[in-house]
Amino acid sequence: MNNNAFHFPVLLDAICKLIEDLPVKSDLIYIDSTLGEGVHAKAILEKYDFLSLVGIERDPQILERARQFLSIFEERITYFNDWFDNFFVNYPLNVKANFILVDLGISMFHYKGSKKGFSFLEDEPLDMRLCSSSCKISAAEIVNTYSKYDLEALIYDLSNEHYSRRISKAIVEYRKIKKIETTKELQSIISKVYPFSKVKINPATKTFQALRIYVNDELARLKRSLPFWVENLAKDGILAIITFHSIEDRIVKDFFRSLSCDLYAKISKKPIMPSFDEIKKNKPSRSAKLRVIKKL
């Protein structure tokens, strides 16, 4: 286990400001829908002793890391090993939440320590399942069995990758000779067909994003959860959602726009973005957007 994989909590100052603006500060329920390693939770629980945490995390490996990381707050925490959409659709608590946090980014542990193939920085098995028991198909199965047209649609629809046709064709041609098994193998296939002049990020970045989203059914879980997140807010409760790419951000934006102004209020018209200083300290935060809604 890599104990150095903990990352910085994104947009923490903005999140703390939301908590400080809650009208009542006594015996409040804070639900972290995407607990991960517990970095947001630790910072929040240290600062606000009037909060009790309900932490939801599907990956049992990372949930155990969170338990260890948050052990000094054990009496204030209830853990659920579940997908957040399952939790909220079948809401098990007898009280509404005062603050719900959703961080849709993948934990740095998954990139650096899980060995599940989320990153192409190391040569790992091409899996990408956050939970192997509930995710039916791995990334390796997708790239080795899906048709060229299905791969092209998947990559484009879930990442806006403009070279999805070239990439899908290259994948299908490569697997005629050899099964694609590792992250470096897939990265190499993609890099060879990507126009060099167009490279601003690693050529494999968007394809890996698309595969991860598809394998874990991320967009469907987000869409399913949104109405239940707002339904399970207490009066004056806050729902704060951090997104990291334009597809999920658009889903959140459109849902917030659909809510009745008589029942809910946006905290800010535009998403809250990380400061220049935060991006300097924590480069992965550069694509983060925080959208917030309050229940009236």
Curated annotation (Swiss-Prot):
Molecular function terms from GO:
rRNA (cytosine-N4-)-methyltransferase activity
Per the UniProt record, one Pfam family is Methyltransf_5
Q: Record keywords: S-adenosyl-L-methionine included?
A: yes
GO annotation (BP), single: rRNA base methylation
Enzyme class, one word?
transferase
Subcellular location(s): the record lists:
Cytoplasm
**Is Cell membrane one of the keywords UniProt gives this record?**
no
Which keywords describe this protein according to UniProt? Cytoplasm, Methyltransferase, rRNA processing, S-adenosyl-L-methionine, Transferase
User: Could you state one GO cellular component term attached to this entry?
Assistant: cytoplasm
| Residues that, per the record, bind S-adenosyl-L-methionine | G38, V39, H40, E57, F88, D103, H110
Q: Per the UniProt record, which EC number(s) apply here?
A: 2.1.1.199
* Reactions listed under catalytic activity: cytidine(1402) in 16S rRNA + S-adenosyl-L-methionine = N(4)-methylcytidine(1402) in 16S rRNA + S-adenosyl-L-homocysteine + H(+)
Chief location of this protein within or outside the cell: cytoplasm
Its function, per the record, reads:
Specifically methylates the N4 position of cytidine in position 1402 (C1402) of 16S rRNA.
**Which NCBIfam families does its entry note?**
16S rRNA (cytosine(1402)-N(4))-methyltransferase RsmH (TIGR00006)
Task: Please name the HAMAP family in this protein's record.
Answer: 16SrRNA_methyltr_H
Q: Which family does it belong to?
A: Belongs to the methyltransferase superfamily. RsmH family.
* PANTHER family linked to this entry: 12S RRNA N4-METHYLCYTIDINE METHYLTRANSFERASE, S-ADENOSYL-METHYLTRANSFERASE MRAW
Please state what the protein is called. Ribosomal RNA small subunit methyltransferase H
Question: Which species does this protein come from?
Answer: Borreliella burgdorferi (strain ZS7) (Borrelia burgdorferi)
